[in-house]
Amino acid sequence: MYLNIAYPRNGTVKQFEISDEVLRRVQLQDYRLGNEVDGAIFGSEFKGYIFRLRGGSDKDGFPMVPGVLASSRVSLLVKRGAIGFNTFRGYQGERRRKNVRGCVLASDIALVNVTISKVGDQPIEGVTDTTAPRRLGPKRASKIRKLFNLSRTEDVRKYVVRRRVVKSGKKDRLKAPKIQRLITPRVKARRAKKAKDAIAKVRASAAERREYLRLIASNRRALRQRDHSKKHTQKVHAQRAEVAAFQKK
């Protein structure tokens, strides 16, 4: 079995091979993805470490899926973006049946991914004793504020992490990322205009509705007046006919 150990604090990852003799002394069925385990079960060099199980795959490359309480392969009906069904495949709303592994460890698991939750006494070579600096800084304005502890009134553009681009035969230059979700006066003006247009649209719609209701009311009033006039005329004619018939007698 291979063990991928990641230390997000330093940004380092390294793969180790665990012998079968070590695995025979461990009941792998007692562990599942998401659990924190003692690093000593994978070897004495990891004594004192606490690992969190993040993922893995079996000997045929089928990935482990969290939440599936099984130690073998299962066939799941999954949608796009799920484990085993890439987003760029299939159609929108389509579901496919894919073979995946459960979240319970077993003896036929070939690779396990873990992260270090607690550092032990002895450093792990290439993982905890080194640091891999990030090549790129944050792009989002809120994350830049969080990184430099800035207030909402301070200008974020002054604190963008720039990197130096070196090319042979050319002058070195600094390259800065485009800040995402940056609130500028232009953005504020656009949002204010959008809100103003929305309010004007609602007011215009309300005015049109009032005019429409007024028109309906006037039409109904005119219809009632016509009906009343018609009934009155019919009543007058009926009375005149009764008077004429009475006079003939």
Curated annotation (Swiss-Prot):
Gene Ontology BP, a term: translation
Protein name: Small ribosomal subunit protein eS6
Keywords, ordered alphabetically: Cytoplasm, Nucleus, Phosphoprotein, Ribonucleoprotein, Ribosomal protein
InterPro entries, A to Z: Ribosomal_eS6, Ribosomal_eS6-like, Ribosomal_eS6_CS
Residues covered by region (Disordered): 223-249
Lineage summary: Eukaryota, Discoba, Euglenozoa, Kinetoplastea, Metakinetoplastina
Record's subunit section: Component of the small ribosomal subunit. Part of the small subunit (SSU) processome, composed of more than 70 proteins and the RNA chaperone small nucleolar RNA (snoRNA) U3.
Location within or outside the cell: Cytoplasm; Nucleus, Nucleolus
Family to which the UniProt record says this protein belongs: Belongs to the eukaryotic ribosomal protein eS6 family.
GO CC, alphabetical: cytoplasm; nucleolus; ribosome; small-subunit processome
